[in-house]
Amino acid sequence: MLTPLQNAAQITQTVAVFPATSFCVEMGANTGDPIGVIDDLALDDVYQLASGQRPKELRLTARADGQLLIAGNSDTGSAGAHLHLDCLITLMPDVGANVDGIVMVEVDNAGMIAAVYLLPLAPLEPQLGYTLVRKTRDGARRRLAQLACVSFTRGTQITLANGTLRPIEELQVGDRVLTRDDGAQRVRWIGQTTTRAIGDLAPVLIRAGVHGNERDLLLSPDHRLLVHNRRDLHRLGRADHLVRARDLVNGGDVTVQSGGFVDYFQLLFDRHHIIFAEGIAAESLLLDPLTRAALPDDHMAHSPGLLMGHQRVASGLDIRPVAAERSAQASQLPSQLRRALMR
């Protein structure tokens, strides 16, 4: 049976943001001003990303009541400061598809604005004009939560309790799915979102045969897979490792699939489980203060105790804090480790 991961690191979410001063109005009512809070924004203003600007990693965590905080080891912001999601905006570029973004506000101890950040939900190009065509206070928290949700893509075959396979889009609430450690478990909720497959929203493709899978597996980049290797690489007494899909990318048989749109599906159970997708052991949705906003409000109202049962599974050593964050390239595991894990 799965147990909560002992001494687990605080659950965090990492997003790539630009300081407000990197994204300023080049033409319009607020010419020269940086992106700001919703009351200061004027529709039809044209913004531009300054040349040479690169996004910074902002690490977030959340209290039980949902209040967002800036976590330690963040590239920007003050650790422990409150973070407010001010609004959701839509930008229309001079060339290409619209880009949504979330305006985030860091608040100091006096309740005053300490900093403003823009979290673009698709890459921004420097020296390109972006016209502000929409601003709203609604939906920002849900969009942020969707970024944190681990997701499978349309067509992914999920193993049911009786051993048969079913495409994820054909699953229904109440269906019994096979879990690695707790037998058959009923699906409590199924989420579905369609998004542009670009940047951090682009899925990772694991080719057939890489991990004993007969078919390709396409899933969200932060989705953790349970990978077994004969050697205990960290001498911690475990040969099973939970590894993010993005950390297995090697440019060959595990790649990022950018371009077009992708249909993402999330599976929620009473607890966090390891299930089987295309035969590969992978985690289900972990419901925590960062991801629960992705669920409909009425679902949480009817299941008030659901969040209490969700803690990270301890089926294997979680590579993310142990190895990935010690690597010189935290976004990707060393090639030697990737090769060993895939044996």
Regions found by a protein language model. Name each.
Residues 70-77, 160-167, 252:
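Short alpha-helix capping/helix-loop boundary micro-motifs
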Residues 146, 153-161, 190-295:
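Long beta-strand-rich cores associated with HINT superfamily self-processing modules
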Residues 87-93, 177-179, 206-207:
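Short conserved beta-strand and strand-loop elements enriched in small hydrophobics
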Residues 83, 152, 165-172, 177, ...:
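Short, well-ordered loop/turn sites that connect or cap secondary structure elements
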Residues 2, 6, 11-60, 68-79, ...:
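Sequence-level preference for short, compositionally simple segments enriched
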Residues 89, 158, 171-178, 225:
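Generic structural signal for buried aliphatic residues
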Residues 98-102, 168, 181-191, 197:
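Short, Lys/Arg- and Gly-enriched loop/turn segments at beta-strand edges
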